[in-house]
A protein has these predicted regions:
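RNase H-like, metal-dependent nuclease domains and their acidic two-metal-ion catalytic environment used
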Residues: 1-133, 139-140, 159, 163-167, ...
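Surface-exposed intrinsically disordered loops and tails
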Residues: 141-153
Length: 256
């Protein structure tokens, strides 16, 4: 079957061709005992990064994967795909996130992902992503990020969020607003198809890199938007407090 001509592929053939011709390139460095950590750019301590991971289900055909993105430019700077235990994966994630300027660390919290998250929390990594317990990201949930009873560690992929996550990656690819450099990710994207209305890997192929990339782009948009709204809200609250404080001081001077 010619997937490019079938009309069932999630990502348009012309967009795939654009990315392959414009951005795809070999990594500058292959790291790790298995050589599966591909690095295109080293850390720049003036930048903010996010590390977004998908934990293997544990079967023989599944992989654990993560991407590192420059948050500001949506540029893929590193990528991992390999076979590794959930606990060891947690240690790898803490190490690489710490290396990349204490990056925001996002790990899907479904099923076996909890074992990885528990290891990250045991290592006391401070910049772990939390999701709202009601699965709805709002300014209020962002402002409550330190009230852990209102949040759950990791990213919650659900029947509601999965289509939104994939739609966000489709949008980024269509608008050419993300820089993807990985041949491995491109290969997954070419066999990512619509099947009974659901986007998924073709039989006998994987989508680990796609899902971690899509999650990164979704969280990037959500986190940046909520951070800005939260900052605006905080400034408004501070301004209101300062005005109230000034009025109170004026009243006290009058009374005095």
């Amino acid at each position: 079957c010619d997937f490019l001509a079938s009309g069932d592929t999630v990502f348009e053939p012309e967009d795939m061709s654009y990315y392959e011709q414009t951005y795809e390139k070999d990594p500058l460095e292959r790291r790790g005992v298995d050589g599966n950590l591909w690095v295109w750019e080293g850390v720049d301590y003036t930048k903010s990064y996010m590390v977004v991971a998908d934990v293997s289900r544990g079967d023989s055909t599944d992989y654990s994967a993560f991407h590192i993105f420059d948050v500001e430019t949506a540029t893929q700077v590193a990528e991992y795909r390999g076979k590794i235990s959930p606990k060891d994966f947690g240690n790898v994630l803490v190490g690489i996130a710490s290396e990349y300027n204490d990056a925001l660390l996002v790990v899907e919290n479904a099923n076996i992902g909890w074992a990885t998250i528990e290891q990250i929390m045991e290592r006391e990594y401070r910049n772990l992503y939390y999701s709202a317990t009601n699965n709805m990201e709002t300014v209020e949930s962002y402002m409550h990020k330190y009230e852990r009873d209102k949040l759950v560690p990791g990213f919650t992929m659900s029947a509601r969020t999965r289509p939104l996550v994939i739609a966000k990656m489709i949008e980024y690819i269509r608008e050419h607003s993300v820089t993807i450099q990985s041949k491995r990710l491109m290969q997954e994207m070419r066999v990512f198809i619509w099947k009974n209305g659901k986007a998924q890997a073709q039989d006998r192929y994987n989508d680990d890199l796609i899902m971690s990339c899509a999650t990164a782009l979704y969280v990037r948009d959500t986190a940046l938007r909520l951070r800005q709204q939260g900052m605006d809200l905080a400034r408004a609250q501070l301004s209101s407090f300062n005005k109230l404080n000034a009025r109170n001081q004026a009243v006290m001077r009058t009374v005095g």
